[in-house]
Design a protein with these regions (language model features):
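Transmembrane helix-loop-helix hairpins at lipid-water interfaces of multipass membrane proteins
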Residues: 34-94, 171-176, 287-291
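Alpha-helical transmembrane segments of multi-pass membrane proteins
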Residues: 39-40, 84-103, 154-161, 180-206, ...
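Helix-loop junctions and hydrophobic alpha-helical segments within the transmembrane domains
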Residues: 114, 118, 227, 328, ...
Length: 596
């Protein structure tokens, strides 16, 4: 099923300056490491800059200009250069190791913040955003930030030093020649900025498309059972091939843009060398510069061009890093629509009184109200069942209690407290949920049960499993409670997964229970055992059950029938049958079977 991508890179693009400012706080955390890295960069730059001066001195001395060339001078200059190379080696080691590690730390910090923000986003975001896209943003996109964080300050710092120093030294040799050479730089900058923009756009498109491709792969691999059951391998192959082709086309366009960028740079390189050959050669002919100065001049120009070329080569890495920061910023800019109010206080465990006061709800992307002016009192310890046709709002009503979604209007109170004014953590700690679609995490049976109570003892975990009727089958597994359940519990049957999910709630032991037909996947024997355990657990606790089999709720304190008009009927099983209304018709359709 297609999903819309919230805050997709195609929606809005921040400028480079804004993105850099967004990134600076992460870089500032490691400013000591950064400054030392830049100091090492300055040392390596010094070593590069000294060589042309040494060669100029030797050449001029050999030509009889200035000092006389002797073996002692050569040895002293060689010794100086040797010492500089030792310093350069030590500085380069720091830059290559500690500098990169700084980048890794920054990437880790950004990924932590992105994941923390994702945990705060509500169901609407995940309903409308593909998991593959999210995965790409917090993994692949941030990989490039490591290189960006290290090389961006370093490369531009080195380039600035080399360009300024080269300009000063070249001007001392020949101002007109230097101005002629540097006249090429502004034009080169204008062309580079233009082509860089095209390059960045291509990289942004690649990131979007790789997210789409990841989502396609994820759907196909996770749905392998369905794919094989319907012999739909060809359809899945075609879906993948389509996404793969689109990614290939976008990447091809990116390389065209990169080729244009690199070619323009080489053309400007050649133009600068041409200026040196013409102007420098003529200066030699007319005696305006010495041969040594010409050698030094050529070496400094070579250094300058190498610096510019390095910046050009870094442009791809720079754009990848900027794209990663941009997509990171888009996650962080996604608003948290459901969070703690400034005056939020913890919800203390209470009797479990729940009150709906004129509650209406509509999904953000659909203006049709699912619930309209619902008012409802659920007494502490009451067992309430919700029945009705699909789309009637049963699940939505239950999802509003733990604030998976925010009410459009009205309010919900638990023990007299508006749930919007209590902390989310405390609210959800007081509610136990067994969903129809069970999700088990990759790990052991014990770890999945302990999810209901972090830090639970082994004895508590085993007792929860016993109450859920899961102990017998768990002990029969190869490693018992330490058995690895596989990704999403793939190694367990549906009934086994359901019982582990129920065990979580037993361990959590909350005052309010929400059950989405918690026993529907169990065999008859287990259903009886778990049903008895649920009865015991529900005693004295407020319990809401979304019922699909009417036979399971005959003894409930109250049954609500929900329809498009809201709550259409309310009463006990016998009272509703006596009314001979909607519930009566549902009961007589398929008595004892799945009716809804």
């Amino acid at each position: 099923m297609s999903k819309t991508k919230i805050n997709d890179p195609g929606a809005h693009h921040a400028g480079s300056g804004a993105l850099i400012r967004r990134f600076l706080p992460y870089l500032a955390k490691y400013k000591k490491t950064l400054f030392l890295d830049l100091f090492c960069a300055a040392l390596t730059t010094l070593c590069d800059i000294v060589l042309p001066k040494i060669m100029s001195t030797i050449t001029n001395a050999a030509m009889g200009v200035g000092i006389t060339l002797t073996a002692g001078i050569v040895l002293r200059l060689a010794a100086l250069y040797f010492v500089l190379r030792i310093i350069d080696g030590a500085a380069s080691y720091y830059m290559s190791s500690i500098g990169h590690i700084m980048g890794v730390h920054i990437e880790t910090d950004m990924r932590r913040d992105a994941f923390d923000h994702l945990l705060k986003l509500d169901h609407t975001y995940y309903n409308n955003t593909k998991v593959g896209t999210i995965m790409g943003r917090i993994t692949n996109d941030l990989f490039d930030v490591t290189e960006f964080a290290h090389h961006c300050p370093e490369e531009f710092f080195i380039a600035a030093i080399k360009i300024v120093v080269s300009f000063v030294i070249l001007c001392r040799a020949s101002v007109p020649l230097t101005l002629a050479v540097f006249a090429c730089v502004p034009l080169m900058g204008v062309v580079s900025v233009y082509l860089n923009g095209r390059l960045r756009a291509r990289f942004r498109q690649q990131r979007v498309q790789i997210g789409e491709l990841n989502s396609t792969i994820e759907d196909s691999l996770l749905g392998q059972g369905v794919v094989k059951a319907f012999a739909a391998e060809d359809e899945e192959r075609e879906k993948f091939a389509k996404g793969n082709r689109e990614f290939e086309e976008i990447k091809t366009l990116g390389y065209y843009a990169m080729g244009a960028f690199n070619t323009s740079t080489r053309l400007f390189d050649g133009l600068m060398y041409l200026v040196v050959i013409l102007a420098g050669g003529l200066s030699l002919v007319y005696g305006r510069i010495t041969a040594g100065d010409m050698v030094a001049y050529m070496l400094y120009v070579t250094t300058l061009i190498a610096t510019i070329r390095r910046i050009v080569e870094f442009a791809e890495q720079f754009q990848r890093g900027m794209t990663g920061i941009e997509r990171f910023a888009e996650i962080m800019d996604t608003p948290v629509t459901i969070g703690d109010a400034p005056d939020a206080v913890p919800l203390q465990p209470g009797p479990g009184d729940i009150r709906f006061e004129n509650v209406s709800f509509e999904y953000p992307d659909d203006h049709n109200k699912v619930l309209h002016n619902v008012s409802l009192d659920i007494r502490p310890g009451e067992r309430l069942a919700l029945v009705g046709p699909s789309g009637g709002g049963k699940t939505t009503l239950c999802n509003l209690i733990p604030r998976f979604y925010e009410v459009t209007s009205g309010r919900i109170l638990i023990d007299g407290q508006d749930i919007r004014h209590v902390t989310l953590k405390s609210l959800r700690q007081n509610i136990g949920i067994v969903q129809q679609d069970v999700y088990l995490f990759s790990g052991t049976v014990a770890q999945n049960i302990a999810y209901g109570k972090p830090g639970a003892t082994r004895e508590e975990i085993m007792e929860a499993a016993r109450l859920a009727g899961a102990e017998k089958f768990i002990l029969a597994l190869k490693d018992g409670f330490d058995t690895y359940v596989g990704e999403r519990g793939v190694k367990l049957s549906g009934g086994q997964k359901q019982r582990i999910a129920i065990a979580r709630v037993f361990l959590k032991n909350p005052p309010i229970l929400i059950l989405d037909e918690a026993t529907s996947a169990l065999d008859n024997e287990s259903e009886i055992l778990v049903g008895q355990s649920l009865e015991k657990l529900a005693h004295g606790r407020t319990t809401l059950t979304i019922a699909h089999r009417l036979t399971t709720i005959k003894d409930y304190d109250r049954i609500l029938v929900l329809g498009e008009e809201g709550i259409v009927e309310s009463g006990t099983h016998d009272q509703l049958l006596a009314k001979q209304g909607v519930y009566y018709r549902l009961w007589n359709q398929l008595p004892g079977e799945d009716t809804l």
